[in-house]
Amino acid sequence: MNRLDDPTALFALLCEARVGGRFWADPAGLARPAAIVVRPRRIDDISGHLDCMEPAERRAALWIAPSAGRQPAQVFDRLVAAEGGAWRGDVDPWSALDGAESLVAHGDDEWVALARFAGTPVQILSPGRFGTPGDDIAELDQQAARALGETTYRDPFSGEEASITATIDLLAEWRRILEANRSIAAACGMAWWKRAEIHRFLWNPQRSLRIVARPSRALTVARRAGGGVAIWPSRVSPMLIETARRQDVPLIRVEDGFVRSVGLGSGLVPPSSVVVDRLGIHFDPSAPSDLEHILATTEFTPRLLARSSALRATIVAAGISKYGAGATVAPPPRQDGRRLVLVPGQVEDDMSVLAGGGGLTSNLELLRRARALEPDAEIWFRPHPDVDAGHRKGAVIDGDAMGVANRIVRGPGMAALLDCVDAVHVLTSLTGFEALLRGREVTCHGTPFYAGWGLTRDLGVVPDRRGRRLTLDELVAGVLILYPRYLDPVTGLPCPPEVLVKRMATDTARNRLGWIAPLRRWQGRLMAALR
């Protein structure tokens, strides 16, 4: 049982989060707020309601049908045709109660409690858990608070008892995701092996997401539904983007998150985190993105920054990077008294390199530029794992790399390497952000998403949009908490980043397509041998 020390504050929290009741249902879609919201228990209740209402109230009423189906629809169609007002079926209660002057309902209807959370006056028709005819506002509020306090809440990820505030926070995040997903009608460019996760990330309870192969079909589906198309940027053509612009169909870009999975995407490991961006995409500095907007405008609260700091500490302590917890192989010894710089290679035709590299795409050239800036340093070169696996472009012959670097490091996990170096030189690699988490110096030769906020040495062209100076915890809050979405690999539910990080740290983030990994490794070795 939850002890409610301040019901008023809790009501305000619920009202702000707009959770409780069937909040995942479609919004009421009212042109103006309803003067009175009426909730009959059964169809045959309607005549009794009408007897208690003035003609003006009937004309301004919003009727909520007690059940779905053809017969109720016909009854309410005739009702509003004769009396005025409007009716809705299964709707989000918060959207129906917005601005309403009163609610008329039975005492066992949870809408009574929701109305009181929202501060809406209520008329009770019959006694029940949430009120009795004649109850005043204070009595109704006590009943609503009692109902909240008598409920036991459980964390869906751990099964342990949870506080009501933690439950509200989780439901509020789910609501935010669902509302964002309502405008997505179709998806295109989604690889077959990640489609199950894409369905979960973009789930809409009222409309199944159509994932289609042909861009023209995706645009047709979206136009008919009045929605947008979710795309994977590297798997769609410029023609789709131009056609969508001409047809005024919004494109929503979906890309891997920054703490992604245990295993490589090129190894067909489905993502446990993605970003869903309506403005652009984080790796393209030529245009605004949702991440840029978040970092430039968010008022970071002390509570959010404390959460960000704790998340960063957990990630660093557990040795987690984009593709999971680091390997147990220890890094090689470094030279005593000499500055140690890590240069991570990238996939040379990766979209982040093409968009944010400022024309530089060569891993060998990146190494040379790092050496020019660090003539006395010990430099370690880390080939990109997708390239080393033989799946992607960007291989540097070891002899060429050793003509510039002091060592090529492949075995240890990235987190372990970052723990032992002094600085990192990157083009646009996520490794630069992971280095910032660990307090390392970062030099950006391109313009990654974390450049331009006052935390890196920036050699690339930084957009004026990034003039704000951020602390590390503010950057982490935007990049890891506010921008991405996460799926719990155990339950399949949307989760906070802390849950996924814990699964990775405890080795419970298993790949559902583990059977295909050996095949992909064999394919990668074959492709590497043929190059």
Task: Identify the role of each PLM range.
Residues 9-11, 46-55, 68-78, 178-212:
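Short, charged N-terminal beta->alpha structural module
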Residues 21-28, 51, 66-67, 77-96, ...:
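A short, well-structured beta->alpha microelement
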Residues 42-63, 240, 356-373:
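Histidine-anchored nucleotide/phosphate-binding helix
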Residues 93-132, 231-240, 255, 411-456:
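A donor-sugar binding/catalytic signature common to diverse glycosyltransferases
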Residues 199, 208-270, 321, 358-359, ...:
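Segments forming glycine/polar-rich beta-alpha architectures that bind adenosine-containing cofactors
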